[in-house]
Amino acid sequence: SRGLGDVYKRQGFIMQLITERLFLIPLQPDGMRALLARTTDPELVQPYTDMLDLSLAHPDQWVWYTAWGLYQNDSGDWVGDLCFKGLPENGHPEIGYGLLPEYEHQGYATEAVRAACRWAFGQPGVTAVEAETDPGNTASQAVLRRVGFVPTGTMGEEGPRFILRKKT
C-alpha cells in the first residue's frame, strides 16, 4: 500500500464510489499533495502536478481533473488511481488508470474503470468515455474490452484509442 491508505482518511471527501472490493475517491488538493509527496515513480510526478494545478484552476469541475484514489474496501489500502483527463470535450471524457504492481491482474482495474464510467455517464452531457493505451499494454487493452470499450481504429499520442458509448 506504500502508506497511501491514509490519504483518504484526511480527505474530508465529499463523494465516493463503492464497488464490490473498492472505494474510489476523487482527491481534493490536500490528497493530491499527499499523493505527490509519496510518489516514487518519476514518470508520475509531472502528471500528478498537472492534475493538482488543473483541479485548483477549475474548482467547480475539479473531479474531472484530479486523481481518484482506489482503495480496498476491507483494508483501506491504496490500490492505484484513475483520472479523467479534463472536462469532457464533445461529451467524451478520457479516462486513464494505473495500479500498484502487487494489485495488477486481479480485476481491480476493470472494477474501478467500470464504476468510474458509470459515474461519468450520470453527468450532464456525457455520451461516451474514451481511452488510449500503449500499443504493447495488452493488459490495459483487456481491461477496456472487459468494460465494453471498443477500438476506434485511430491512434492517439499514447497508442490505440478506445471508446465506450453510453447505452440509451
Where are these regions (language model features)?
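Conserved active-site alpha-helix within GNAT-family acetyltransferase domains
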Residues: 110, 135-152
